Regions:
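Compact, glycine-rich, soluble single-domain proteins
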Residues: 28-164
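N-terminal secretory signal peptides that target proteins for export/translocation
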Residues: 1-6
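Bacterial N-terminal signal peptides
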Residues: 11-25
Length: 164
């Protein structure tokens, strides 16, 4: 390879490396801070589908930054804890497990709180996209295995208002 071509290729690699450091380095994805955002908390009631009410202590993810961070870097979770993602409208929702250290159950709910679909025991660190089977407004993430342990079935629905 001619010297000039090697130089251009080396320059390209250097620029690519610099971009990688700036975009995905310690400050996070394209400049977003890796610091965990503050989350409001609430009590969530969930009818598991047979009239039995379950209660969870949840962190509320309501902003794009909170949606992006979610439960990343959480090392342990109580059986009655979770995170409720609240979106502005209905859409097919897609989640992955990047930087998530524990298995999670993901429950997708429509704007009336009815269970649309669920993913059980999503593997930590997986980059596989987990999508709702239909439009959803809410996504509840619980400790992996909670759906089975708590008997949450296809007729499950959220109880509103939150914290009530």
């Amino acid at each position: 390879m001619p010297a000039r071509a090697r130089f251009n290729f080396a320059g390209f690699l250097a620029c690519l490396g610099l971009f990688w450091i700036v975009a995905w380095g310690p400050t996070g994805a394209l400049g977003a801070s890796w610091d965990r955002p503050d989350f409001a908390t609430s009590t969530l009631s969930l009818d598991r589908g047979d009239g039995t009410l379950l209660t969870y202590r949840v962190e509320l993810a309501t902003t794009p930054r909170q949606h992006a961070y979610g439960l990343m870097h959480v090392e342990a979770m109580d059986a009655d804890a979770g995170m409720l993602f609240i979106f502005d409208g209905m859409a097919v929702r897609s989640f992955w497990m990047k930087n998530t250290l524990i298995p999670l159950d993901m429950l997708f709910f429509d704007d009336e709180g009815r269970l649309v679909s669920a993913v059980e025991k999503a593997a930590p660190g997986s980059l596989v996209s987990r999508r709702s089977s239909g439009p959803a407004k809410y996504v509840l993430e619980l400790k992996g295995g909670s759906m089975q342990a708590d008997g949450i079935g296809s007729g499950a629905h959220l109880r509103f208002p939150l914290g009530g």
